[in-house]
Amino acid sequence: MGIQNIPEHELARLREKAKEITGSQFDYQSSYTELLSRRLNGEPLQYIEEYVPFYSIQINVDQRCLIPRPETEYMIEIIKNNISAPKKILDVGTGSGCIALMMKKLFPDSEVHAVDISNDAITLAKENAEINNLEVNFYQSDLLTNVEKLDFDLIVANLPYIPTCNLPTLQKEVIDYEPLIALDGGEDGLLYINKLLDNLKNTDSNDLLLVLEVDTSHAQSLRDSFTDWKDVKLEKDLVERDRYIVARK
């Protein structure tokens, strides 16, 4: 990547970050050069800035987590439109904690739990909870392995859904910097989603709402596989692609 490939708005953000680091509006060139070098090497701007805005909160991000995408942020709207006052919420594959923390902010009276297979991600999510002064129960778990009781009103999941063979086609900055464990969905991209659905065959909830973010190429076939669920529907993302599955059990 050459400097001519970096948009001016990104250069401006790097300058602001350099000023923040140095505490100076003028003597920041050395820091700016270092940050620019990192960006030229392909490091995502969000990791360099160390945070991203997510809906109405701020989330710290680094290589312990996947950078939240607009599709995941829009998932909050999907949830809001489908449930009003869940008492108990579970976020599966929480990563930075962004969805779980927004759930707690939107539904402050709810008990919110969030799990991830990565201990590093859980540590970061706890840091983000402290930064945003929000109380969420974060703990390490391979999907639902360490979840004691499945008595949730709402389960949200944004699990890895990229087929292993497609990983080399991703942008270089994604492959080189973001955690592959948060991207690799196995041979067909459905490994973890199918495991989660299998885990949910028996729940302790009388009225469970499940909201999944999925690959657009999987959406239709996945919806058709929800044979023991009711009110199964697809919801579209910001560019009108089938991106979310909403189902009740």
Name every feature range the model reports, one short phrase each:
Residues 187-248:
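Conserved Class I SAM-dependent methyltransferase catalytic core
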Residues 14, 42, 72, 99, ...:
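Residue-level signal for inorganic ion chemistry
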Residues 1-11:
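Non-catalytic nucleic-acid substrate-recognition regions in nucleic-acid-modifying enzymes
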Residues 11, 32, 42-45, 96, ...:
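A general structural signal for well-ordered alpha-helical segments in protein cores
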Residues 74-169:
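Conserved SAM/SAH cofactor-binding pocket of Class I
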Residues 49, 140-141, 214, 236:
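Short loop/edge segments at beta-strand edges and connector loops
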Residues 161-191:
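Mobile active-site "lid"/loop adjacent to the S-adenosyl-L-methionine
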Residues 13-78:
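Conserved AdoMet
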